[in-house]
């Protein structure tokens, strides 16, 4: 028999979660290499229904955002095929690329969410890019406005 919907829940509003990301980096101006020393995130996703899962979601999104910001890039050859056809060419961050990662939840009760919760999925990948770009700017005096911010881009922008 076909599935039958017996009950649904929708909210008249979709309250946004909030997150701030702060990063401490070590930057070699000669090579352009950026090392993440410490990343601090403060997240307001209402009342997390499953705090352990919310933490894992946040940590994973931060690492993915760091990869997107510093190393993940897709280029194509003359025939339109991706040049990065394996993880040997397409770099993603590993635990060795990370320093300390600290996530703190700022609880707020959201009356329109289930049990006071808000969403958390997409917000976590959004803060590493601006945080890292600002840290690089503070270290070099140069704003980078395209991602990924590669070591070559940093070294070329700081060459005297």
What is the meaning of each model-derived region?
Residues 1-160:
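C-terminal catalytic domains of large/alpha subunits in multi-subunit enzymes
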């Amino acid at each position: 028999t076909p599935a039958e919907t017996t009950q649904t829940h929708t909210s008249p509003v979709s309250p946004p979660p909030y997150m701030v990301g702060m990063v401490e980096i070590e930057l070699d101006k000669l090579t352009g290499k950026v090392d993440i020393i410490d990343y601090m995130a403060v997240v307001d996703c209402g009342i997390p229904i499953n705090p352990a899962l919310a933490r894992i979601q946040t940590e994973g999104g931060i690492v993915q955002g760091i990869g997107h910001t510093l190393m993940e890039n897709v280029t194509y050859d003359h025939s339109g095929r991706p040049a990065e056809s394996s993880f040997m060419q397409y770099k993603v961050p590993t635990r060795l690329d990370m320093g300390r990662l600290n996530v703190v939840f700022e609880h707020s009760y959201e009356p329109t969410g289930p049990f006071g919760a808000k969403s958390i999925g997409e917000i976590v990948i959004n803060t590493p890019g601006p945080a890292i770009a600002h840290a690089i700017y503070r270290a070099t005096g140069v704003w980078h406005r395209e991602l990924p911010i590669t070591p070559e881009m940093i070294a070329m922008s700081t060459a005297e």
